[in-house]
Amino acid sequence: MFSGLTNQFTSLVGAVKGGAGDEDVPAPTGDAPAAAPAASTSVEATASSAVDPEAAAAAGGEGLEGEEAGKRLPKSASLVDSLVSEATGWLGSAKGWLGNASIPSMPAMPSMPSMPAMPAMPSIPSIPGLRKGAGADGAEGAEGAVAGEGGAAASGAVSGGEDDDKSRYISATEGADSHPASGGGTPTGDEGQIGQGKGDEVKITTKVTQQAKHFGSFLSSAISKAGSKIKETVKDNTILDSFNKEQEAFIKGQGGVGNGAAPWIGHANEAKIKEEILGLSQDRRNFVRAPPAGVDFEFSYDTAYPTAIAIMAEDKALETMRFELVPKIITEENFWRNYFYRVSLIIQAAELGTLGADGVGQASSGEDANEVATKEKKSKTAEPAKGDSSVKAIAEQPKAVIEPEAQECDVQAAKSKAKAKAQAGKELGQKISESEFVSDDFQASSESDLAEIQDGMRKLGIDSMTQQALAATDEEQWEKDLEAELKDYEVVDEGGTGGDGGGGRRKGRKAGEDDTEADEDEPTISNLRTRSTNNDWEEYADLIEDTDDLK
C-alpha cells in the first residue's frame, strides 16, 4: 500500500515540477530509520545522475543562463523539495514502526524520454506586479548555490524552474500554436519549419514545373510551325488555281485545244452555207428528230464539241435552244448528233453545187414535205383542164378509120401503162408523206466525181430519194409521149349509126364525167396524176364503141 502511495505521490511531484524531475527515485533500503537523511541525499544524487545526457549538455551550453535561473528560482520549488524530503523520511520511519518487515522495493521508474529543449524564448518585457521581490531573489540565489554543488543536476533544476515560470505565459493549449521545440537531431534552420517542403520535395516540384514549361513551349512552337505551313500552302495552292487547272484538263479532254473552226469556213460559197446553218437553230424539230434509219452517219461528240462551241459563238439562238432542250427533253450527245446531221446535209449540197435549190440544204421537217405535196397537187389539178381541151380538139378533127386489132392493142398497152403510172404515183406520194427529209436529184458535174458523190449520197440517204425523183420525171415524160402518139390517130364517123353511136358516146361521156367528179371530190396523188389520162381514155373508148357499131 505504501509503495502505491509513494508512486502516486512521486508522479504528482514530477508533474508539478514540469519536466525538472526527470530522475529515477529509488526505493528506500529499510535498514534503519536513521537512514532517512541519507536516503534523501541519495535520492537527490540519483536524480542528478539520472538526468538525460542531452539535457545536461544543453544546460552546460547555457551555464550562465542556468545560474541566473537558479538565482531567480521561486520559493515554490524549494517548498516542494522540502516536502519530498519530509515525506520520504516519514515513510521511512513508518516502515520502522511496522517492524523490520521486508517490504519489496519499488521498481525503478523507466527513464522517460527527455523533452527537447525549448529554444531561447525572446525576452519578455517585465510586467509590474508579476516579478518577485529582492528577498526572494536572494533565496533563489542560495538555493541555486546549493544546487550548484550537484553540477549538472543543479542546471537541470534551474531550467526546470524556468520552464515552470514560463508556463504561466503559455496558452491553455500548452503551446500548440507556438513553434515546436526541436532536439539536437532535429534540423530547424536548414530545412524550415513544419508545413514547408523539405529539400527533396522542393527539388521534385521544381523539376515538374520545369518539365511543364518545356512541354508548353514545345506545343506553342509546333502550333506556330503548323500555322506557317498552312499559310504557305494556301498562298501557293489557291482554290482558283485548282479550278483553272481542272478546267484546262477538261478542255484538253474534250478536244485537245480550245474552240474549233466553224463548218462554213474554207468553202467557196461561205456566206450561203453560213446562212443555211444559222437557220437551223430556228426550228426545234432539227434537234429532237434523229437521222432516218439506215443512214450511215458517223458522229463523235468529243471531236464535234469544239466545232459546236465555234457555232454557238456565232449563233446565239443555238445556245438558247440548247439551254431549253438539254437535258429536259434530249441528251447533250443526241442534241448535237441531230444538229450536225443537218449541217452535213448543207455541206454536202454546197459541195455538189445544188445549194439554194428547192429543198436542198433545208432542214428536213414535215412542213417541207407538206409544202412539196401541196405544190404537186396544184400542178396536177391544172392538168385536167388541159386534158379536156386536148380531147375537144381531137373530137373536132376529122375522124379516121382505125383498125380494130390495132386499137385493141393500143388500148391494152395504154391501160397497163396507166396502171403502172398510178401505182408509182401512189408509192411516191406515200414515200413523200412518210419521209422526213426532202432533197432534189443530184447530177454529177463530171464523171471523175461520180463515185465520190454516190458514196456521199449513200451515207446521207439521198440515193433512194434521187431515184424516186428520177422515176417521177420519167413518168411525166411518158405521159407527154403517150399524148403525142394519140394525137396522130384520126377518128372516122360514118352516118347510119350516128344516133346510136352518139348516144353511146354521150353515155360514155356522162359516165366519164361522173367518174371525174368523184375523183375531184376525193383528190389523191394518184388521181391527180392520172386524171388527164383517164379523160383521154374515155374519149377513145367511145371511138372503139363507134367502130364496133360500124362493123
UniProtKB/Swiss-Prot annotation:
Q: Where is the composition biased (Acidic residues)?
A: 514-523, 536-551
For this protein, the record's InterPro entries field holds:
BSD_dom (IPR005607), BSD_dom_sf (IPR035925), BSD_domain-containing (IPR051494)
Instruction: Output compositional bias ranges, type Basic and acidic residues.
Output: 373-386
Q: Which residues are modified to Phosphoserine?
A: 178, 182, 433
Q: Locate the BSD domain: which residues?
A: 295-347
- Compositional bias per record (Polar residues), positions renumbered to this chain: 524-535
Q: What is the superkingdom listed in this entry's lineage?
A: Eukaryota
Keyword Ribonucleoprotein recorded: no
Q: Name one GO cellular component term.
A: synapse
Q: Where is the composition biased (Gly residues)?
A: 182-197
Tissue expression per record = Expressed specifically in neurons and transported to synaptic terminals.
Q: Where is this region: Disordered?
A: 20-72, 117-198, 360-391, 487-551
Q: Which UniProt keywords apply?
A: Phosphoprotein
Which GO terms fall under biological process for this protein?
A: associative learning; chemical synaptic transmission; regulation of short-term neuronal synaptic plasticity; TORC2 signaling
Q: Name one Pfam family in it.
A: BSD
Q: Which residues carry this modification: Phosphothreonine?
A: 186, 530
- Compositionally biased, Low complexity: which spans? 26-59, 117-128, 137-146
**PANTHER family attached to this UniProt entry:** SYNAPSE-ASSOCIATED PROTEIN (PTHR16019), SYNAPSE-ASSOCIATED PROTEIN 1 (PTHR16019:SF6)
Q: What is this protein called?
A: Synapse-associated protein of 47 kDa
According to its UniProt entry, this protein's organism is Drosophila melanogaster
Which taxonomic lineage does the organism of this UniProt entry have?
A: Eukaryota, Metazoa, Ecdysozoa, Arthropoda, Hexapoda
- Gene name, per UniProt, is Sap47
